[in-house]
Curated annotation (Swiss-Prot):
GO terms for molecular function: large ribosomal subunit rRNA binding; structural constituent of ribosome. Binds to 23S rRNA. Forms part of two intersubunit bridges in the 70S ribosome. It comes from Picrophilus torridus (strain ATCC 700027 / DSM 9790 / JCM 10055 / NBRC 100828 / KAW 2/3). This is Large ribosomal subunit protein uL14. The gene is rpl14. The keyword rRNA-binding applies. Pfam families: Ribosomal_L14.
């Protein structure tokens, strides 16, 4: 995992239901906690593009349901600014399941992946079909 510079707009708060866009068997996951997030007291934790978070599988195959997993945000609907000044927003929110070390659990990713997530997580960039 590489660090990212600058501020990032976090668009997925605690409890958000996020579609899982890989082929692990999970369809919908709920955000429980964001890893390595340091904020002010009593602020609701939120995740943005490229953040790793802990989630619970809400919909999916019977083997995956109600499991606690790690995931990385690859798309978010809330607009965020890149270093060159452009504003980026996707049509949907999406996440990919990973191991605690950052290895991708699936073998394919459906849809585009944000460049910020691909730069931070090389394993996600390796299996993504489109990087925006």
């Amino acid at each position: 995992m590489k660090g990212i510079s600058g501020r990032e707009t976090r668009g997925l708060p605690l409890g958000a239901l996020i579609p899982c866009v890989d082929n692990t068997g999970a369809k919908m996951i709920s955000l429980i906690d964001v890893k390595a997030l340091h904020t002010v007291a009593k602020r609701i934790p939120a995740a943005g593009v490229g953040d790793m978070f802990i989630a619970s599988v809400k919909k999916g195959t019977p083997e995956m349901r109600s499991k606690v997993v790690y995931a990385v945000v690859v798309r978010q609907r809330r607009p965020y600014r890149r270093a060159d000044g452009t504003m980026i927003e996707f049509e949907d929110n999406a996440a990919v399941l990973v191991t605690p070390d950052g290895e991708v659990r699936g073998s394919e990713i459906k849809g585009p992946v944000a460049r910020e997530a691909a730069e931070r997580w090389p394993r996600i960039a390796a299996i993504s079909s489109t990087i925006v």
